[in-house]
Amino acid sequence: MINLRKTHPILKIINHSFIDLPAPSNISAWWNFGSLLGICLVIQILTGLFLAMHYTSDTLTAFSSVAHICRDVNHGWLLRNLHANGASMFFMCLFLHVGRGIYYGSYLYKETWNIGVILLLTVMATAFVGYVLPWGQMSFWGATVITNLLSAIPYIGTTLAEWIWGGFAVDKATLTRFFAFHFILPFIITALAIVHLLFLHETGSNNPSGINPDSDKIPFHPYYTIKDALGLMFLLLVLLLLALFSPDLLGDPDNFSPANPLNTPPHIKPEWYFLFAYAILRSIPNKLGGVLALLASILILLIIPLLHTANQRSMMFRPISQTLFWILTANLITLTWIGGQPVEQPFIIIGQLASMLYFMLILVLMPLAGLFENYMLKPKW
């Protein structure tokens, strides 16, 4: 009898996607993050579902309902800690996944890359609305500051901000709709992830060398299922260490105080994974300019395929591009640090220089490095 997984209409799709999928024989651990992101998404949906059973999206009871989950619900503290730190793990995997794509030239699969950028934006939106739900001080003021940026849009800005708020400020209507968004968006992310995979399987995976791997493929199972399982062990180890030993390490102490519109925290800042973009926003002393720079810092990923000038796909054999890539990485870490600092010297000038370097590297220096490397490869005699 022919194997059921190869004939059954549904199992056949799963088989072609995760079992008999031909994969390059040389993909490294940097290719683990796709599966880890899928697992992060499942963890977030499951923990979020159980949290939603006990959470109330009302300004009067939201904060105390989160406290109730942590104190009175069976293993509620664990669910909350896994969900909060799961978001951090999600973004860690996302940044590494995008970094891998830039380093090895995976962005040349344009459809897969563009869906990936849309996924990144959707995950960022989900994390933002989710951070508002506990209704602590930083939740409230973070929501106020970021949604207020919409008012910088000429002509329609104020109307747009009030439409999002459902009133004249962040209040009960805002919290209720943010809870609704936070519930639905992960399912939209799941659908987008399936489309992302669909486009990826049209072309097959890239590999570290950037050379067409069609002549040397191996089945995904058991080789890469085992490899992904190892990655999963590391992910769960770090997540559990965070959730069980220092669950509040990455959070903000201000969020232990209930939201108070009459008392502004000394330093309003988002979660660590938004700090790089927040630093770019703050580095421009103009509201609309800052908003445009914030958008550009993420949307610039969409034009990376158009800026590829090198004859080789991967950076594996391109030392100048490699150097610039690691300067970009260090620059993003610097921006993340600056985003968490108060708006005073020397942080202002460091942030402005780092923001300028970020755009310079992607738009000018990396394409020029590609052209120079092409020139260096040509025989000179």
Swiss-Prot record:
Entry superkingdom: Eukaryota
Gene Ontology CC terms, in alphabetical order: mitochondrial inner membrane; respiratory chain complex III
GO biological process terms on file: mitochondrial electron transport, ubiquinol to cytochrome c
GO molecular function, one term: metal ion binding
Gene3D superfamilies: Cytochrome Bc1 Complex, Chain C
Positions annotated to bind heme b b566: 97, 196
Keywords associated with the record: Electron transport, Heme, Iron, Membrane, Metal-binding, Mitochondrion, Mitochondrion inner membrane, Respiratory chain, Transmembrane, Transmembrane helix, Transport, Ubiquinone
Cystine crosslinks: none
One of the Pfam families matching this protein, by short name: Cytochrom_B_C
Residue numbers binding a ubiquinone: 201
Membrane-spanning intervals of the chain: 33-53, 77-98, 113-133, 178-198, 226-246, 288-308, 320-340, 347-367
Membrane topology, record value: Multi-pass membrane protein
Co-factor note (free text): Binds 2 heme b groups non-covalently.
Location within or outside the cell: Mitochondrion inner membrane
Necessary cofactors: heme b
Residues noted as binding heme b b562 in the record, renumbered to the chain: 83, 182
Family: Belongs to the cytochrome b family.
Further remark: Heme 1 (or BL or b562) is low-potential and absorbs at about 562 nm, and heme 2 (or BH or b566) is high-potential and absorbs at about 566 nm.
Xref: PANTHER family: CYTOCHROME B
Record function comment: Component of the ubiquinol-cytochrome c reductase complex (complex III or cytochrome b-c1 complex) that is part of the mitochondrial respiratory chain. The b-c1 complex mediates electron transfer from ubiquinol to cytochrome c. Contributes to the generation of a proton gradient across the mitochondrial membrane that is then used for ATP synthesis.
Subunit-level organization: The cytochrome bc1 complex contains 11 subunits: 3 respiratory subunits (MT-CYB, CYC1 and UQCRFS1), 2 core proteins (UQCRC1 and UQCRC2) and 6 low-molecular weight proteins (UQCRH/QCR6, UQCRB/QCR7, UQCRQ/QCR8, UQCR10/QCR9, UQCR11/QCR10 and a cleavage product of UQCRFS1). This cytochrome bc1 complex then forms a dimer.
Name under which the protein is recorded: Cytochrome b
Lineage: Eukaryota, Metazoa, Chordata, Craniata, Vertebrata
